[in-house]
Amino acid sequence: VIANSNSEKDQNLKYIVRDNLINYMNTLCNNCKSKEETIEVVSNHISNFTDIANQTIKDNGFSYTANVEIGNFEFPTKTYGDISFPAGYYDALKVNLGSSSGQNWWCVLYPSLCFVDVTSGIVPDESKETLKDNLTDEEYKLISDRNDSTINFKFKLIELFSHNHILTAKN
């Protein structure tokens, strides 16, 4: 969902539209068992998503409209707790509000990572299991492994002096 602008009112509306669309999607796609099935169901109901978004906009006193489309869109890296999705192109339902020049909110349609606890960013175990079932072991490892490697900063000049036993200061 891409807000009309970054004004507080437009950003708040974005979340109201989001919540209404998620509620509809939850009932519509609750029993979907694959990404392909989810895309098919959403595609078949695209006009309903548009109607819900437009009605929400109108009910909240705004005069612009929503444009809703399904496609393959570019997304930034997104991390939910211990799951990270790399930046790239993903199949998604894209909702543009008004001029769509504001900040966006995005989620993964399948499995339903839209429904995570936004405050803690925790991915439910059920969604993790669905990911495991739909990804190869290598793909799942890529998104779920935490990179806990430590970064060590070094100064080459200090290493050179230390290695060659060169004193830099005397008492």
Please tell me what each predicted stretch does.
Residues N6-S7, F73-P76, G102, L113-F115:
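Solvent-exposed loop/turn segments at secondary-structure junctions
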Residues I83-I151:
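Soluble extracytoplasmic domains of inner/organellar membrane proteins
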Residues V1-I2, T65-E69, A92-N96, W106-V108, ...:
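Soluble periplasmic/extracytoplasmic beta-strand elements of cell-envelope proteins
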Residues T79-Y80:
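Glycine-rich, charged/polar anion/phosphate-binding loops
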Residues L28, H45, T56, N96, ...:
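Residues that form generic nucleotide/phosphate-binding pockets
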Residues L142-N171:
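Short flanking/linker segments adjacent to small metal-binding domains or redox-active Cys/His motifs
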Residues K35-P76:
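Amphipathic, coiled-coil-like alpha-helical scaffolding segments used for oligomerization/assembly
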Residues V1-I46:
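Early exported N-terminus immediately downstream of N-terminal targeting peptides
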